[in-house]
Amino acid sequence: MLKLVDNTTTRDYISHHLSHLQLNLNNFTLVNHPDIKSFWILNIDSIFFTLLLGIIFLLIFFYTAKTATSGIPSKLQTIVELLVSFIDKNVNDILFCKNKLIAPLALTIFIWIFLMNLMDLLAVDMLPYIAMYILHIPALRVVPSADINITLSLALGVFILIIYYNLKIKGITGFIKELTMQPFNHLIFIPLNFILESVSLLSKPISLALRLFGNIYAGELVFILIAGLLPWWSQWIISVPWALFHIIVITLQAFIFMVLTVVYIAMAYEQHK
């Protein structure tokens, strides 16, 4: 544990593990004071691991596609085919229309978020220890989905797709009419309708982002508290059962994000009918 190596307090240990490696875009220097808040500060550790996991996902699926065989499949090909079939079935159950983009999008969202969540199961001190004492990096957080900036970015992408499909299917006039003439179909209620529908529309990406962030951040915090508060010989008693339970949580959160994305897009088709 870093706490034992540095002889720091439990508070310092927890604070260190919740600190990001940040870059100040004003002068392109690393931020030495994590308490500084600015729009021009990037959590470069979250961005790095998000991109890295995305590349790993693409490489695995590209390799599987290149080596796929119609004969006896490899274990990797079997897993990928099961995942593709599972996602495709769920998308078809939700979206009752032909769209070649939605299933690949759902697969990408599920696998990418699952890989980000999976980083939460790594040993709490492993990568931060390597970063500090070998690479001389002052801080490092390795779970991208425990960063609200990442989950909001993902949700923003979903929100753009929701707007795009609403405009594509209903047209600008139809979309504006939906925002202003529902739920009360009278001209006098246009301001009220617009407020209600706008809140409903904006709540979709916000709820997606906060749900994913809250669950994964809480799981990360529990692991840090176990490592920071308990003696080393007793940590396994709690951390192993929590890790087993957390496997369900990280999978479920990736699945929920994926399903709700498809549901929100499907609503554009259903409401048009």
From Swiss-Prot:
Pfam families: ATP-synt_A (PF00119). It is found in: Cell membrane. GO terms for molecular function: proton-transporting ATP synthase activity, rotational mechanism. It is a multi-pass membrane protein. The chain crosses the membrane at residues 41-61, 101-121, 122-142, 143-163, 183-203, 221-241, 247-267. Key component of the proton channel; it plays a direct role in the translocation of protons across the membrane. This is ATP synthase subunit a. It comes from Baumannia cicadellinicola subsp. Homalodisca coagulata. The gene is atpB.
